[in-house]
Each structure stands twice: as structure tokens, then as C-alpha cells.
Amino acid sequence: MPKTKLTSPPFKILKCTECDACINVPSILQSNEQAECPRCHHLLASGTRWSLHRCAMIALSILILMPFSLNYPLLSLHLLGIKIDASIWDGIWKMAVGGYEYTAFMIFICAVVMPITFALLVIMLWLAKIFQIKPRSVLLFLGYIKAWVMFDVYLVALGVTIFKVREYATLEINIYLIPFIFTALLTTLLFIKLNLSALWQEFYPECTSVYTKQAVELCPACHYTFTQKSIHYDHQQKICCPRCQSPLNTSDKLKLQATWATLIAGIIMLFPANLLPISGIYLTGALSEDTLISGVISFVKSGSYFVAFVVFFASIFVPISKIFIMLYLLACVHFKWQHSIKWQMRLLHLVHFVGRWSMLDLFVLALMMSLVTRGEIINFTVGPGAFYFGAAVFCTMLSTSQFDSKLIWKIYDREK
């Protein structure tokens, strides 16, 4: 008697991570297909993905190129007949030993630790597949660190530094800039092609899909859609996800408290960041200090209008705009303002996208520290405002990540 072939239903249920809607999605997507939420247009699933083996080879290439990108000079400055080299690591080290260890630590996390960790995690996934290990923590951590990998921001900071240093001496671009550019491009490519949802399903095939809209739950950590019957309990009898074991009972009040706490901390830090000098240059013994806004003005006076715009946008406009947007969205939640829901979601997506670019100014400071340090003739120093600026960027990024977009949609659904 021939065996009957079991086939899965043509459609499964996915719960949107942005608006909480339950959507029918094809069980199998072709390589050129993707599924979007019809209500908020958030990407639910994509058939586009590279094999884990290919992603691991790219991650391995990143790790091979990383020593050349971090340790070797990207730029060289010719000053008074002396050649001064600038590398990422050299700038961070000089900043740390110069008394600005907290600012250096923030740059070290975003420019060194997170890119290396990202590549290592992808390779760990590949090894986990070979040795048939369930890499729950690796998959969770990959989802958390993507916003903190800032090699592309450092690449733009390099361009800003070139325009800033050319006022003082002749600048030379070294051949090691090529592996740095390739590292930034490969990291960005890996971001695009790494499909975390597909990897979760690949490593945890026993976590089956849902085919009914009755009593459906969503894990905020691994984005797994499951029925209430599948809910697990940890050793403390708290509700957790059956796939990643993350807690599910976090109340809306706690989410708002975390968002408010980090946002208020960011607002407090932004005042000294804008009022105190962020950098200073000693020229023949005379100190010339710059705040964020005076640095932009100096670029305008020198005729570097595009660079002035980039620095103004990343260092002044973006941090302040992020705070006003987050205050507006939080006010919408607390006072139940039902404005244009799509406009509110666009603002939230904009904050998520541009927030990391505020680190541009700190990366420029690190490069300047490694280039312009020549004793009594010319010397560059980091100002006290640099730490507060970095802390403000970190706090506002944490605030954005803590904010749950479903809180806005709940107002919209309640009014309907």
C-alpha cells in the first residue's frame, strides 16, 4: 500500500511584530517573494536568504580583514617633516590613556567589539549547524547587536576627518583603507542577507507554524507565532516562549517606564554635550575649543558646506529630533492621541534608522586624536562634552529599542 505524502497547509498565521495583526502568509515563499503586513506594511517573512555556509564565509572574510582595518594606518599626516599614522585602534588607545577612558570605551564597543562579535556569532551558527547544537543564545544576541555595529558610520567619519585635518597639514590615504572599506561593505552585506527568521526555523523545526487565528501569541525576542496551548513555564513558573525561553509577561507599564528612564537620561546628558567643548586644538600653545555647533560653523567658514551639513545632521539635528519624536510618541500613548497612525510609524522607523549615525562625531574625535598630537607645536584634545554626547546617543538608542510600537496600534484599535 503506497504511503500518503503529508503536506503542510498552503497558508500559515504570522502575528505582526509591529501592529499585532494576525496575517495569513504562504507557508513556502519563493526566493523572489516576501510577505508584508497589509495594515502597517512591516516585513513579516522573506524568501530571500543566503545559505548559512555562504554567510559564514563572509563572516570569516570580515575577521581576516579586521586586523588590517583596525591596527594598520588608514590615514597619514605629514606635519613638519614627520609622518603620523592614524588607525582605529591607535585613536581609541590615545583617547583612553589621555584621560578619556569612558569615551574611548564607548567607541571601542561600537567600532571594535560589536563588529567582531557579529562576525563571530555568524561563524558560531555555522559550527552549531555542523555539530547539531541548538544556538538559542547566539540567535537572540544576533538580533540585539545589529544596531550597534557601526563600521559604516566610521567610514563616513573618516571622510569628515580628511576635510577637518587638511587645514593643518598634508594628508595621505594609505592602502589599508581598502580592507577597511571592504570590511564595512561585507558587514553591511551580511546584515542584508542574514535572515534570522529563517535561521530560527532551521534550527528549531520542531516549533511548528500556526494555522488558526484563535488564541495566538507572539514572542517579542524571536518573533515566533504560537498558540496559547504551547506556552511554557520556567523554573519560577513564569510564562516564557516555547522556542527561545524569553519571558512573555512584560507589562506595558514596565516597557513605558524603561523607555522614559533612558529617554530622560539622554535628555539630561544632551545639555552638557551641547554646552561644553567637545574638542580642542593647541596651536603654538594657544587652545582653541569647539562645541558641537561651533565645529559646524568652522566647517562653513572654511567652505566645506557638505561636511558641515553631515556633521550638523548627525551630531545636532538627529539627537535633538530623536528626543522630540520619542516625546511625541510617548505623549500619544499616554494621552491616547489618535493622529495619523502611518505617520507615527514612519517617525518611529526614522528614529530607529538614523539614531546610530549620531556616533559620527565621536569617531571623528578618535581619528583626530591619533593624527594631530605633536607636543608643543600642535596638539588635539578631547573636550568634556564628548562623554556626555556619547552617553546621550547610547541612552536615546536604548530608549528607542525599548519602545513598543504595538502601544500606538492599541490606541488605534481601541478607537475602532
From Swiss-Prot:
Disulfide bonds: none
Annotated GO biological process: membrane organization
One GO term describing the cellular component: plasma membrane
Alphabetically ordered keywords of this record: Cell inner membrane, Cell membrane, Membrane, Transmembrane, Transmembrane helix
Subcellular location: Cell inner membrane
Topology with respect to the bilayer: Multi-pass membrane protein
Keyword Chloroplast among record annotations: no
Source species, domain of life: Bacteria
Keyword Cell membrane: yes
TM region(s), chain numbering: 62-82, 107-127, 138-158, 172-192, 263-283, 306-326, 347-367, 377-397
Location (main, coarse): membrane
InterPro entries, A to Z: PqiA-like, PqiA-like_proteobact, PqiA-PqiB_transport
Family: Belongs to the PqiA family.
The protein's name in its UniProt record: Probable intermembrane transport protein HI_1671
Annotated organism of origin: Haemophilus influenzae (strain ATCC 51907 / DSM 11121 / KW20 / Rd)
Lineage: Bacteria, Pseudomonadati, Pseudomonadota, Gammaproteobacteria, Pasteurellales
